[in-house]
């Protein structure tokens, strides 16, 4: 009877190797040693951990929208931490417009590394003008430098009516014209076989430095003084308007390092502070010396006053008594009785001796002495006794004054 090839129970000789491997695997499984309990627990824990990992990863995979093709999906890249915008602190008594200028330069124009130098109190003032505030900033490139300076000048003219003189700024079309002319010169040199100049040449295109000088802006109400106000008959150059000069120095990074204005003006400020400190110390020492001398003189003066509580100087009494006599003989044509003379002498002596010598004017003393001397030289007096007395007392006055 022929074997049916379609009957599954019939063994096919072509696939005999399958039966041998199956049998061998079965025999091997029967001959293996039994699995320990520890291995069973380990396999169970590993399986549970894999299940938890797959369950945790399932929401992430489900979160991805499969309707968007892979080439349109946006993978959030790790962005670099941006540096916060740093605006320098305002100096004491700042102009009202200074904060607006700093915010525009830093935020709108996008210049970096701002530094503010307060040069308002420099003596003598800088060449850029008295009461100067200097701002130094860095641009990212040559093009950024010119765009920022041009926008800054237009902003000041449009918003605040200020005219900024931007030295080194190239206009919007001027840069293209200069580059075209430079390329044309290079082509001409190449055609005639000339060598192209090498090195960092100043061709007037790459400046790397723009100095924006603002016109005077309004000063703080507490900062309205002018240089030389405390000097009588001031001689020199200064502006009458009590404003503040602001200068913005814009650099590329390489040019700023090369120029190094911070070190220059920082040294000037340090020198002025050092000189001011030395002057203040000297004034303080001088004040202390004066106070010490005054404190030492006070007990000495009080001691001298205690010791000199005596009557007035005899010379002073002689002088003022002789001045009283001149009232008796100030008019040679007038006759006085003895009673009148005695009363006048008593009144004038009491009045004059009750005052100090400093209370009388020098002109009065000189006039009185002149009249006494005139009487001494021979003016006629009615009574001989009075004449001799007047001459003797006039001699005493002249001797005391000598």
From Swiss-Prot:
It is found in: Mitochondrion inner membrane. The gene is ATP25. InterPro entries: Atp25, NT_sf. This is ATPase synthesis protein 25, mitochondrial. GO terms for cellular component: mitochondrial inner membrane. PANTHER family: ATPASE SYNTHESIS PROTEIN 25, MITOCHONDRIAL. Residues 1-60 are annotated as: Disordered. Belongs to the ATP25 family.
